Amino acid sequence: MLAKRIIPCLDVTNGRVVKGVNFVELRDAGDPVEIARRYDEQGADEITFLDITATSDGRDLILHIIEAVASQVFIPLTVGGGVRAVEDVRRLLNAGADKISVNSSAIANPQLVSDATGKYGSQCIVVAIDAKRSSAPGEPPRWEVFTHGGRKATGLDAVEWAKEMAARGAGEILLTSMDRDGTKSGFDLELTRAVSDAVPVPVIASGGVGGLQDLADGIRLGHADAVLAASIFHYGQHTVGEAKAFMAREGIPVRI
C-alpha cells in the first residue's frame, strides 16, 4: 500500500494565514513563509496553499508569496486561488508551485481542466471541491458543490462533479466538507467515502479535523489517500510528526 500523506493547509488572505469556521469567522494564524517552513521541518509530505478570497475579490495571483514560500520549502507545494486560465497555471509553476488547484474556474469553464492537464500533465492539476450536504434527514445522502470560497451554490452534485473532473484529467481531488470546516468534529466520512469510491484518482480529505483519530478515520473509514488539516497544526495542538507517529501506530503506512 502506498504511503498516506499528511498535508497542512495554509488558507491565505491579504498575505496572512487565516483559519475560519464553516468558511467564515476568519482568525489570523501568522506569516505564510514562517508557517510553511515550520511544517517542512516537522516532516509534512506536502503543503497546500489556498488564497481563499482571490476569486471572490477578483484579485490576481499572489506570486510573490508563492516565490517566497517555494524558496524556503522543499516538499511539494500545491497552490490554489484565483487560477482562471492555463496561463495562470504556467505562472504559478514558474513561481515554484508543484501542483495547481482549481475550483471556481473549473466550474465556470470545465475545459480549463482538460487544457491544463493536456499541457502540463494530470500530476500537477488538483481540482478542489467544496461540498455541503443538501439532502434532508432520511433521504439518500447528497452534497452540493459551492464556489467562490463557499459563497455561491452551483446546483452540481459533488460525487458526479468529482467523476467528471477525473474524466477530464484531474490528477487529484481536494474534497472539503463545508459543514465540517473548522468545527473540529471530524471529516464528513460519508462524503469522503462516496467521492473516494467513485473516482480512480487520489482524494484528499479536508474539513473538520479536531484530533489525530480524525486523520486516521479519514484514511481508514473515508477511503481517502491523503488527509489535510489546518487548525490542529496552526495553533500548536499537534505537530505533523505526532500525527505521523499516531498513524503509524494505527497501522497506516506513512513516511516517517
Curated annotation (Swiss-Prot):
Active site per the UniProt annotation: 11, 130
GO MF annotation terms: imidazoleglycerol-phosphate synthase activity; lyase activity
Name used for this protein in its record: Imidazole glycerol phosphate synthase subunit HisF
Family per similarity comment: Belongs to the HisA/HisF family.
Function: IGPS catalyzes the conversion of PRFAR and glutamine to IGP, AICAR and glutamate. The HisF subunit catalyzes the cyclization activity that produces IGP and AICAR from PRFAR using the ammonia provided by the HisH subunit.
Pfam families per UniProt: His_biosynth
GO cellular component: cytoplasm
Catalytic activity: 5-[(5-phospho-1-deoxy-D-ribulos-1-ylimino)methylamino]-1-(5-phospho-beta-D-ribosyl)imidazole-4-carboxamide + L-glutamine = D-erythro-1-(imidazol-4-yl)glycerol 3-phosphate + 5-amino-1-(5-phospho-beta-D-ribosyl)imidazole-4-carboxamide + L-glutamate + H(+)
Localisation: Cytoplasm
Listed pathway(s): Amino-acid biosynthesis; L-histidine biosynthesis; L-histidine from 5-phospho-alpha-D-ribose 1-diphosphate: step 5/9
Subunit note: Heterodimer of HisH and HisF.
Entry-linked InterPro entries: Aldolase_TIM, His_biosynth, HisF, IGPS_HisA/HisF, RibuloseP-bd_barrel
EC annotation from Swiss-Prot or TrEMBL: 4.3.2.10
Gene3D superfamilies: Aldolase class I
SUPFAM superfamilies: Ribulose-phoshate binding barrel
HAMAP family: HisF (MF_01013)
Keywords: Amino-acid biosynthesis, Cytoplasm, Histidine biosynthesis, Lyase
GO biological process, one term: L-histidine biosynthetic process
Enzyme class: lyase
